[in-house]
Amino acid sequence: MRIKKGDSVLVTTGKDAGKKGKVLRVIPDKNRVVIEGVNRVKKHQKPSRSLPQGGILKIETPLNASNVMLVCSRCNKPTRIAHKIMENGEKVRICKQCGEALD
């Protein structure tokens, strides 16, 4: 997948389009990502040992990875990425806007 945990991303489509956030979790087999503060839904939680009071919780739900764009840390713009193999054999993600390595 082109997006990794901890990356800064911009949501491009849906009800949260235009919001920026940090990737909390990546689910590669379903091509989904969970982003901090984005795509929040209300979950009705029954009382349990871990949450004795119960109540309504707001949780982040996964988005399809195709609906987000990586934000470059150097140029601070949403960008597509390229992959490049360095001389030492390491595969690195490259920003298409400024050419800077993202890893």
Swiss-Prot record:
GO terms for cellular component: ribonucleoprotein complex; ribosome. Gene3D superfamilies: 2.30.30.30. CDD domains: KOW_RPL26. GO terms for biological process: translation. One of its GO terms (molecular function) is rRNA binding. InterPro entries: KOW, Rib_uL2_dom2, Ribosomal_uL24, Ribosomal_uL24_KOW, Translation_prot_SH3-like_sf. Belongs to the universal ribosomal protein uL24 family. One of two assembly initiator proteins, it binds directly to the 5'-end of the 23S rRNA, where it nucleates assembly of the 50S subunit. NCBIfam families: rplX_bact. This is Large ribosomal subunit protein uL24. It comes from Syntrophomonas wolfei subsp. wolfei (strain DSM 2245B / Goettingen).
